[in-house]
A protein has these predicted regions:
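Glycine-rich, basic loop-to-helix element that forms the pyrophosphate-binding segment
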Residues: 103-120
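Acidic donor-binding loop at a coil-to-helix junction in glycosyltransferase catalytic cores
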Residues: 204-210, 219
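Conserved catalytic core of nucleotide-sugar-dependent glycosyltransferases
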Residues: 128, 136-201
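Nucleotide-sugar-dependent glycosyltransferase catalytic core
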Residues: 219, 232-256
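Acidic donor-binding segment of Leloir-type glycosyltransferases
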Residues: 62-102
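N-proximal low-complexity "stem/linker" segments adjacent to membrane-targeting elements
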Residues: 1-66
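Catalytic beta-strand/loop signature of glycosyltransferases that borders the donor
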Residues: 155, 221-228
């Protein structure tokens, strides 16, 4: 089982022949999309978050409000029929840049993401998870990286194990380079991509499939560095998309150590790829 998990972790989800072709593609410009480089007045971001867990309302809003990037909106999709939308709108109605929608729980995560993108007003989409941590410079760094590719995000990330208070790094040496996949909670892309690639109608692996489909269409993926984001492992309190126990997951990471405050480790506000508006 461990060998299978290790193979799954390091897999780039693309066969050898396609990898060779992609290496050639990475040296070429994205001329097929004819998307002009952004100028400052054009760069506005639609942050989308899908959740079926009411307890993360505070975290969703804090991640958004923490961002130093000013020109943005937040679209929240509630994907559980038991969730009371009025409990969210009572708080969000005072913020004109935040909109909340409720989608039937029978609909997949991929469906919800596509729904949110259709509602988005701006020309950059940033997919944020409900339970992770996004530092103040997260959006600024991601937006600036769009000059390298039409889809950006992180492959190497910090991981924080809440129960043991352990900070670690996964997928090391996958920073500031073109890659074959990106971590789902860190996907940031130009909205024009949605005309070519959409999320598949499923709730597991929709982010990996999105990356695969981008590659098939000749759309490059660029990974920034690991700073400004932490993947939070909540232990037994939550069911994660990848159902693997913490102790086994730690063996797939580089352990930094036991820390109470991981924020001081992961925030890097002097990033070269910083863009403040």
């Amino acid at each position: 089982m461990k060998k299978n998990i290790l193979a799954n972790l390091i897999s780039q989800n693309i066969d050898i022949a396609k990898k060779a072709n992609y290496k050639i593609l990475l040296k070429q410009k994205n001329t097929h999309l004819s998307i002009k480089p952004y100028t400052k007045p054009d760069i506005k971001v639609s942050v989308i978050t899908c959740t079926n867990r009411p307890r993360y309302m505070k975290n969703v809003l804090e991640n958004y409000h923490r961002q130093l990037y000013r020109d943005k909106e937040l679209i929240i999709i509630l994907n559980d029929n038991k969730m009371k939308i009025n409990e969210w709108t009572t708080i969000t109605n005072s913020y004109p840049d935040i909109t909340v929608f409720q989608v039937d729980e029978k609909k997949s995560l991929g469906y919800c993401l596509n729904y949110a993108i259709e509602k988005a007003k701006y020309n950059v989409i940033a997919k944020l998870d409900d339970d992770d941590y996004y530092g103040p410079e997260y959006l600024s760094q991601a937006v600036n990286a769009l000059k390298y590719a039409d889809v950006v995000g992180k492959y190497c990330t910090y991981v924080y194990f809440e129960e043991s208070k352990t900070l670690a790094i996964r997928n090391p040496k996958r920073e500031n380079q073109y890659v074959y996949r990106l971590e789902g909670p860190t996907l940031v892309f130009r909205k024009e991509i949605f005309n070519t690639v959409k999320f598949k109608d499923k709730s597991l692996g929709e982010d990996i499939q999105f990356c695969k489909d981008c590659l098939k269409k000749g759309i490059k993926l660029y990974a920034t560095d690991k700073h400004n984001y932490v993947y939070i492992r909540h232990g037994s309190k939550d069911k994660h998309a990848w159902n693997i126990k913490d102790e086994l997951y730690k063996k797939l990471c580089i352990i930094i150590g036991e820390v109470e405050d991981y924020i001081s480790f992961i925030e890097y506000t002097k990033t070269k790829n910083s863009h403040k508006k």
